[in-house]
């Protein structure tokens, strides 16, 4: 899910992401460590979906393979090793006839050298909550909001919205619908359960339409006598 687990609970004690799972029809199943829930019925075979995607993209002028630029800092063996594993994952999952990961480098600043000139094909980046509400996460991907950091600086979808091409219409319609759902949820301020249910609908819509794809949860562990939530950089 896009929102981190454990961020917030409704008045019945239900953890928020379980509401998203219910909206997506995944509440009765759990990840088995091998096959994604939505691909489990066919054993993880994406060949039909891949064929459909290539046909639809070819129809609007896309040529294959698509080259995805992924930037890492130059001179870092760890970053290169990680990117090499990711490149192999692309090969194994998509096939080099569909998507090829191109490993590229920046010297010192990903912001100045990659993000600002919009050279990235995608970015793997984390987000931490400032306070315990789903809008912390979902609000980062909306349109028509200068505070939607990811829309403006990572996916650049906010800039696409200013003058979308014909082939981008369906995508922009989906983002507009998602934005409306988030704004409607955020307007509910006197009923916590209704607010979380509405946000869950928005998040499910985002995930089902793959407006963004969650990658992993980064969980840090430490052994300490201090209360982590009493520190200056506590999550919220």
Question: Which residues make up each language-model segment?
Answer:
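Detector for C-terminal structural segments
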Residues: 1-26, 74, 78-88, 114-236
């Amino acid at each position: 899910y896009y929102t981190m687990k454990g961020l917030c609970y409704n008045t019945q004690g239900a953890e928020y992401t379980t509401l998203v799972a219910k909206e997506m029809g995944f509440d009765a199943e759990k990840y088995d460590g091998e096959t994604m829930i939505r691909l489990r019925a066919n054993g993880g075979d994406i060949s039909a979906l891949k064929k459909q995607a290539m046909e639809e993209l070819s129809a609007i002028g896309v040529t294959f393979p698509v080259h995805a630029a992924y930037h890492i800092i130059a001179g870092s063996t760890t970053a290169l090793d990680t990117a090499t594993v990711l490149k192999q994952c692309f090969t194994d999952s998509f096939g080099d006839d569909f998507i090829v990961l191109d490993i590229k480098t920046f010297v010192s600043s990903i912001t100045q050298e990659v993000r600002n000139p919009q050279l990235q094909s995608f970015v793997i980046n984390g987000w931490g909550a400032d306070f315990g509400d789903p809008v912390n996460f979902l609000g980062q991907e909306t349109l028509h909001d200068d505070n939607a950091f990811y829309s403006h600086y990572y996916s650049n979808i906010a800039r696409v919205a200013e003058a979308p091409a014909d082939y981008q219409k369906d995508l922009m319609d989906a983002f507009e619908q998602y934005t409306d759902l988030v704004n409607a949820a955020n307007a509910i301020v006197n009923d916590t359960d209704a607010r979380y249910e509405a946000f869950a609908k928005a998040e499910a819509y985002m995930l089902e339409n793959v407006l963004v794809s969650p990658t992993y949860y980064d969980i840090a562990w430490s052994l300490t006598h201090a209360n982590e939530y009493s520190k200056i950089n506590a999550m919220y």
